[in-house]
Amino acid sequence: MALAAASGSLLLLLVAAAVRVLRGPSTTDPEALRATVVVGVEISRDTPIDADLQKEVSTRFGALRESFQALQPAVRLQVLVLPEDRLLREVQRRSRSGLAPDLLLVNSDAANQLHRQGLTEPWAVPSPETDQLDPAVIARVRFAPGEVFGLPQSLQPQLACFDRGRLERSPATLQELLRASSEGKRFGLTVDLLNLAWTLGALGALDSTADVLAGKPVTPLTRSRIAGWLLWLRSADLQQRITLTPSRRDLIRRFQAGEIDWITCRSSDITRLREALGSRLGLAPLPDGPAGPASPISRLRVLALGRDSSPAQRRAARALAAFAVNPQMQRALTLRTQELLPVNRNVPVPVESFQDLAALVAAQRQSEASPALEVLTQPKARFEDRANRILIRFHYGELDTTAAADALIETLRQGAAP
């Protein structure tokens, strides 16, 4: 499934919803499927629902739709864009009317949450679909023995996006970043725990943060490392040419407008940024730090089966999902978008031929090298909003370093509760 749209207000129906079961062209093929399949696509809460988003989703979905419908011309596909912060409520609301999506393309934590709420059906493991996927991504979606809560579809690593017209290359270390800032280059970061997670490893606070969230005892060393991380953020915020903002949307807008030269971004942002910067857009892994390598979080996009489908819709949805992860489609979508990484283990990424894909692979390797990140993305603890409020209060000076560290540790401890 190539709907790697951005991990707004209500949902946008990109193709007008029609009947749930369609008449389909006449055919004598006993294997032909006839159904209307509604596909729900989760987007980041910071992604504006506008004409640009519609174009992005249409472009990504077009290749998959055209190829799949060449095989199954009697399957009609409709796409719903579901904002991240309203995803669960919207699927619950539609499910009460029996109109929930037949297939969902969402982040793995959302897929887990939907499954725990009884809103999706599991996939069996092993199966022909899961057998061809990287075992590491299967491990991230395993729910119980013999089943996963969704079928992995693609990876969206976090990385650095920069303006080649202003920066010859992206800083390889935090020290280089600070030096470039002092020389007049402008940098932007989002005040958001998961978007700042890459600095936890670079500054030596990742293991401490993960330990607290895992319910381990809080030691003086734990507090010291988390406080040290906050001190670096405060120091960076005081730099004239380093911008910290709570709004990722605002950060991207300012980068597009040429007000900032370098930002942290997610691979799902690349299409929009290419539209604005063209060949000036540069991609690179995030900077390492004095205490270790960068530790960015890579989003795993997952295909989950809805529970309200008719038998015909379920067969068509499963066929579409299986088609989306086959080697040919995974390779085609990777090369076409150059903003997502395949999960099919039989699809090598041609990093020698494509500079942007090489940057994505390097960013993904950073994430895979930091196993402590896994606990930060577990859906059992939806602590992000509380943690982000603490970081924003710290950013605006309402909390000093000690108070912010104490509050953040308490929030992480509460997140560890079952």
Regions inferred by a protein language model and the residue ranges of each:
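Conserved N-terminal structural module of periplasmic/extracytoplasmic solute-binding proteins
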Residues: M1-A110, Q414-P418
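Long, aromatic- and glycine/proline-rich binding clefts that accommodate carbohydrate-like moieties
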Residues: L335-R389, R393
